[in-house]
Design a protein with these regions (language model features):
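A conserved pocket-lining segment of Rossmann-fold NAD(P)-dependent short-chain dehydrogenase/reductase
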Residues: 84-85, 141, 170-181, 193-215, ...
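C-terminal substrate-binding subdomain of Rossmann-fold SDR/epimerase-dehydratase oxidoreductases
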Residues: 202, 206-210, 214-315
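NAD(P)H-binding glycine-rich loop region in Rossmannoid oxidoreductase-like domains
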Residues: 55-94
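Conserved beta-loop-beta element that borders a ligand/cofactor-binding pocket
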Residues: 115, 120-121, 156-181
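Conserved Rossmann-fold NAD(P)-dependent oxidoreductase catalytic core, especially the SDR/UDP-sugar
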Residues: 100-147
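N-terminal Rossmann NAD(P)H-binding glycine-rich loop of SDR-like oxidoreductase domains
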Residues: 7-27
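Glycine/proline-rich active-site loop of Rossmann-fold NAD(P)-dependent oxidoreductases
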Residues: 153, 166, 179-192, 217-218, ...
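Flexible, glycine-rich beta-alpha linker
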Residues: 125, 146-147, 171-189
Length: 315
């Protein structure tokens, strides 16, 4: 159990944050959620404390940290790739400057920190052809496709510098495509949208083709919770556990599972302009399994099945 631990979570109301916070509180830790908007439902969540604020606002950030006096920090707050593309200055303000302000505040305030976890991304990597048969390893070269990836590289650099300066155990955890309950925004939310469409017997056009490294959303929350609470020392970069499949394979598995529920994928198709998209896939997670052996990894088929059940109950 983690009673007595005080976990400061940025982006605690997002898809990943919601799942991570639930698991952290289940272990008895208090959570201080730092967000621009409050959670929709706080009933029965006596261990959750909402603090309103903006990552790019240095004063509100410092005030929030002073109020929380956290022992652990889970930094999930960020704009996603489409928002960074469409609003690059705001993306830089939140993803780059907000991250820098958080690390600086933690250093300046001499908080009683036992752990800092930074949510990075496989967007720091490049085309699959750059990497060997063992997959994309955390130590492999950076080669991002966009500003979002470059800002995540900067975040990883700040995380390592922070650990070297403070000796606070620090983890940068990378992930690729999240699917399942709670995933409703971002370009790669397409596969979750396809599952929802199947449940509702609606048509849906998938906007891209290619291969993706899939992570079940509840596993993602659990992965960040484990990186935050489980024993760890020093600094490390890790790939979140997941499974690589093509979009075609995802649709085929969705069809198999849909059939078990009397549903069909007949209305799911590719958009006419769907092109091969250079996603990062084949993430090597050997080091992750060694460092955090209790991280879960639900198979893609089981995750799709659980997602159908979740969206049916919600529908």
């Amino acid at each position: 159990m983690s009673k007595g631990k005080r976990v400061f979570v940025t982006g605690s109301t997002g898809c990943i944050g919601t799942h991570a916070v639930e698991l952290i509180m289940n272990e008895g830790a208090e959570v201080f959620g730092f967000n621009r908007s409050a959670p929709l439902d706080l009933s029965g969540k006596s261990l959750y404390h909402y603090i309103k604020g903006d990552l790019a606002d240095q004063q509100s950030l410092k005030a929030a940290l002073e109020e929380a006096r956290p022992t652990h920090i889970l930094h999930l707050g960020a704009l996603q790739t489409p928002d960074c593309r469409d609003y690059p200055m705001r993306g830089m303000e939140v993803n780059l400057m907000g991250t820098a302000l958080l690390f600086k505040a933690c250093s300046d305030m001499q908080l009683p920190l036992e752990r800092f976890v930074f949510a990075s991304s496989s967007a720091v990597n490049g085309p699959r052809s750059l990497y060997g048969p063992e997959g994309v390893r955390p130590e492999d070269p950076y080669q991002p496709f966009n500003l979002y990836g470059y800002w995540k590289i900067a975040g990883e650099g700040m995380a390592q510098a922070f650990q070297q300066a403070t000796q606070v155990p620090t983890v940068s955890l990378r992930l690729a495509t999240t699917y399942g309950p709670g995933r409703d925004r971002g370009f790669t939310a397409a596969m979750t949208s396809a599952i929802k469409a199947v449940v509702k017997s609606e048509s849906y056009e998938i906007p891209y083709r290619g291969r993706e490294n899939y992570h079940f959303s509840i596993d993602v929350g659990a992965g960040f919770a484990r990186a935050t609470l489980d024993p760890f020392s020093g600094y490390g970069v890790y790939n979140l556990l997941g499974e690589t499949r093509s979009v075609d394979e995802f649709i085929a598995l969705l069809g198999e599972e849909a059939d078990q529920f009397g549903l069909s994928t007949d209305l799911i198709a590719y958009a006419e302009d769907a092109e091969e998209t250079p996603f990062i896939y084949d993430l090597n997670d050997d080091a992750t399994r060694s460092a955090f052996p209790s991280m879960p990894n639900t198979s893609l088929q089981a995750g799709i099945r659980a997602s159908i059940q979740f969206f049916q109950a919600e529908n």
